[in-house]
Amino acid sequence: MPKVQSNKSKQEKVIHPYSRKAAQLTREAHKQDRKDRLKSEKALRLSIIGEKLQWFQSHLNPEKAEYTKKEACELIESYLHRFDNELEQIELHNSIKGRQTRRHESRETVIKQTIERERQLYNGYGIEIPDIVNSRNLKVFRDWDLDMKKLPNIKMRKISISDSLSKSDKDVPGSNDEIENELGSNEESMPDFQES
């Protein structure tokens, strides 16, 4: 004879809050939250890098086989001024008479903070851009189809404002070599004092 099923519905067991099972479920939930947070942070970082690379790719001169460091610095300067039109439009909206509140204030703040951060990087140890100084890396970058999975194939290089100065601009009078040469010549011309 077949078994008669009871009318009791299966209820989920209530887990005691201090049990090992509750601790395990809490750990799993925290682990999943951490994974989701890291995944979203990585996606945000990749999208920012992707936008930067897309801007550089669209502003490259197609006739150039490679760029000098000075030309790369000029390209970076134009990159740092990419928001100028948008800031002008925001200023124009805010300058209209009769407006008591500033429109697009949060966007304006974000743009100014981004520009300031990138300017500090450029003036400091360098801003990271695709390696357009090397002709082979430039060709790979031009052939890139904006696929983020192929991002590791693109070589990056840090370029700072000091790279825009030519070699002759860096050799300022009074450099270390000149000072050492002057000190050496002064030592030779000094009279020797003999003790008696």
Swiss-Prot record:
Its Gene Ontology cellular component terms are: nucleus
The record ties this protein, via InterPro entries, to: Tma16, Tma16_sf
Q: Does the keyword Transcription regulation apply?
A: no
- Region annotated Disordered sits at 1-37, 162-196
- On the tree of life, the source organism's domain of life is Eukaryota
Which spans does this entry mark as compositional bias, Basic and acidic residues? 27-37
Please indicate if the UniProt record lists Nucleus as a keyword: yes
Record localization = Nucleus
| Gene Ontology MF, one | preribosome binding
Spell out the subunit comment: Associates with pre-60S ribosomal particles.
Tell me which family the UniProt entry assigns to this protein: Belongs to the TMA16 family.
Can you say what this protein is called? Translation machinery-associated protein 16
Q: Tell me which species this is from.
A: Xenopus laevis (African clawed frog)
Q: Provide the organism lineage as a comma list.
A: Eukaryota, Metazoa, Chordata, Craniata, Vertebrata
State which gene encodes it.
tma16
